[in-house]
Amino acid sequence: EFLSIANTLMQHIEEYVPTDFPPIYNIYRWWNPPQAEFLAKLKSAIKTVEDDAVVQLLTVSFCRIVIELSNAAFNHVSTSFKDGNEGFFSIDIAKEAFISVCEMVAKGALLQPRATSKVLLHDSRSIPAECYGAYDTVITSPPYPNRISYIRELRPYMYWLDYLETSDQASDLDWQAIGGTWGRATSLLGTWKSDHSLPQYVYDIAEKISNADNKSAGLMANYVLKYFEDMQKHLSSVYAGLAAKGREF
């Protein structure tokens, strides 16, 4: 049914009234006008589907095509851009690309986990008390201390899916994340205060960083301290969730 609906949407895609473009800064740097128009029509088309499960699969496919049709380049650790004037756009090729993505998503959807799963939104630096000692295995993948911003990399999806409307919202999310310092979050580092929960040698290293001959040395020192203080809270929280003889990966 999912693929059948996807094919039907593509057959009539040019008939849909496009949604408003997302308020991401300088949108035509991300997508040329024809690509942005196609995505806006596709978003409008998906909104007409009533089956929630199909909508979820279409949304996953939409996220993939958002990047495939973009000017984003991945030749650097952080997203950069190709020349916005490069490339020829064909709506027929875009339709074929979307169906191809849907077919890939459909194959993945057939691989269902055997265990029951639950998704909880919470701060990984402080897990709920009811989770203490509850798990025999915990897998965590914290961010690396390289100042890469995950919210910066996820902006295309977050804006197209209406999770973000302003750059301040993105900055606020990044400030809440471990290691996040994108946008306004960078300036917040200037007033951030350490809780002195780490071994003294870490603070000695941070002091050396702050004394470096660089105008951003103080901010970088605070970044290092905030990252490792957040990680200390995260790892302590992870271990609190482990049952006796539990394992953490």
Question: Which residue ranges define each predicted feature?
Answer:
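Class I S-adenosyl-L-methionine-dependent methyltransferase module
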Residues: 1-110, 151-218, 239
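Conserved SAM-binding strand-loop segment of SAM-dependent methyltransferases
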Residues: 113-126
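A short acidic, Gly/Pro-enriched loop at the edge of an enzyme's catalytic core
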Residues: 126-139, 147
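Short, contiguous acidic/charged loop-to-helix segments that flank catalytic cores in large enzymes
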Residues: 218-229
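Short glycine-centered segments of the SAM/dcSAM-binding site in methyltransferase folds
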Residues: 247-248
